[in-house]
Amino acid sequence: MDTILLFMLPAGLWAQDAGVAATTAAPDATAGALGELATGLNTVWMLLAAMLVFFMQPGFALVEAGFIRTKNTANVLMKNLVDFMFGSILFWFIGFGLMFGIGGFVGAPHFFNLEAMDKIIDNGLPIEGFLIFQTVFCATAATIVSGAMAERTKFSMYLVYTVFISVLIYPVSGHWTWGGGWLMNGDEGSFMMRTFGTTFHDFAGSTVVHSVGGWIAWVGAAILGPRIGKYGKDGKSRAIPGHSLTLACLGVFILWFGWFGFNPGSQLAAATSGDQTAISHVFLTTNLAACAGGFFALVASWMKYGKPSLSLTLNGVLAGLVGITAGCDLVSPFGSVLIGAICGVVMIFAVDFIDHVLKIDDPVGASSVHGACGCLGTILTGLFATEEGLFYGGGSSFLLAQLFGAAVVGVWAAGMGFIVFKVLDKIHGLRVPKRIEEEGLDIYEHGESAYN
């Protein structure tokens, strides 16, 4: 009997070891499955957000088409189409590596080498999905310029501009911020930490996307000069109405819808309850800012001009959306209403100042909506952020960091835009001949009209 027990003992011990191994393996397998599920949810959310941001492209096209005359509609639609097509290829080929590669001032480029970029970024998301998400943001910055330079720009020169913003201007300043560069480097001893004790914050792109496009639009419109007939001999501005506020209104609603991918999608995760709470908060602050921007622009235009202007109210909605994009994750719902309201009112006066004082002809108000309000919204985040904001007892450090970051990116974008457009103007001329401008760009540039 003792002999039998002696032989059974190792078998019993082996069975216990197998049980322990099975018990250990089960949690590991469960954890792995949950990890894969979380990655899947995050990926689907990111790609869904990318689709929403892509849908902003027809929104921009309709807004710009509505704010210009019929004879130039096909031209502006073509520019919105082409900057996405060109920009997508160029950003994949060069811009993505410059923006997210390793480096302080600019990332080391890995030309169309997504395998190398995947090892560098390592954010748990498929690299191809992350690329397409970032591509639609780059395309947004590029297309902002189209409206400001509408009705008088050579199509060929616009294509050249698209190359520069997609492979250089946007990726470099994007690297400083979202690419782990010096403006958002929180390491001890980094420039921002030594200077301000905190880093620059731009959650979804008030500065990184919108003010970059807005400042380039402002510089481009200034170099290009006003449309024929915009200013009289006495220097007074003359209104040149767009041909369809219906299209413009539809475009704004599409942009508003797309912004629910632009801002909440920048969370880049949706698997945990914390992610879902953050996404919901950003949805709310984004919508409230849009509503406040539109409402206060309506009131301001009513008080200033005697009647509530639809075109200015539409731009007020966009101003609120642009303004809240930097701090939509940090501010309270009340703070988002204040940011939207301030941006909506400031947009009215920025349009007036640029048009009547600076004498810069911006047919759609892009430099006011995206440039001025993108910069302003970034700065207001330093006031209304509930943890570090000045109005919440956070001191001035965060506000100063926001001011500095917005200024640096603005100078970069405006400076590079000035160089690009000046060189193009000297080499080949930015502007179409006077006769073509008077007859319209649709037939001259494309051989077809938007309306028959």
Identify the residue ranges that each predicted region occupies:
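N-terminal secretory/membrane targeting signals
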Residues: 1-18
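Glycine- and aromatic-enriched membrane alpha-helices
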Residues: 14-452
